[in-house]
Amino acid sequence: MSQLTHINAAGEAHMVDVSAKAETVREARAEAFVTMLPETLAMIIDGSHHKGDVFATARIAGIQAAKRTWDLIPLCHPLMLSKVEVNLLADPEHSRVRIESLCRLTGKTGVEMEALTAASVAALTIYDMCKAVQKDMVIGPVRLLTKSGGKSGDFKADSHD
């Protein structure tokens, strides 16, 4: 089994030293879902929500969150992201919104946390914008879909819906 990288020999939390690592292209994708009543989703789709464009606001929030991950998650490195993408898709069949984020950089550490943070904060933003019309929306699951680059190799989540 792998070791926890953020715990030192004394069992204390610490920031991982990446100074000796090679710079490689690293990319991660994550997804999150927000499930809601069909009426709430319809307001988002037809643009009748009184707070404005829910998807545009959630997209911007997700992008901003990816850029601030180092400030939100202890022990994350500040990264020079070269690409952050947040896509939102209304899924009327399941009465939910699917959020997929992509983060990419050329650097010494991965971007999994940035991708997960982008998807999570976009989901939280949808909740925030729609809570006046529905408070029992459900956020989740949130998960890493893919990761590439770096010493630990590539990862691809099992597909399920």
From Swiss-Prot:
Quote the EC number: 4.6.1.17
Q: Which major enzyme category is it?
A: lyase
Q: Does the keyword Lyase apply?
A: yes
Ordered alphabetically, the record's keywords are: Lyase, Molybdenum cofactor biosynthesis
Pathway(s) it belongs to: Cofactor biosynthesis; molybdopterin biosynthesis
Q: Which reaction does it catalyse?
A: (8S)-3',8-cyclo-7,8-dihydroguanosine 5'-triphosphate = cyclic pyranopterin phosphate + diphosphate
Pfam families given for it?
A: MoaC (PF01967)
Gene Ontology biological process: Mo-molybdopterin cofactor biosynthetic process
Q: Which residues bind substrate?
A: 75-77, 113-114
Q: Name one GO molecular function term.
A: cyclic pyranopterin monophosphate synthase activity
- The reply on keyword DNA-binding is no
The protein's matches in HAMAP family, at most eight in alphabetical order, are given as: MoaC_B
- Record's function text: Catalyzes the conversion of (8S)-3',8-cyclo-7,8-dihydroguanosine 5'-triphosphate to cyclic pyranopterin monophosphate (cPMP).
Its protein name is Cyclic pyranopterin monophosphate synthase
Q: What is the lineage of its organism?
A: Bacteria, Pseudomonadati, Pseudomonadota, Gammaproteobacteria, Enterobacterales
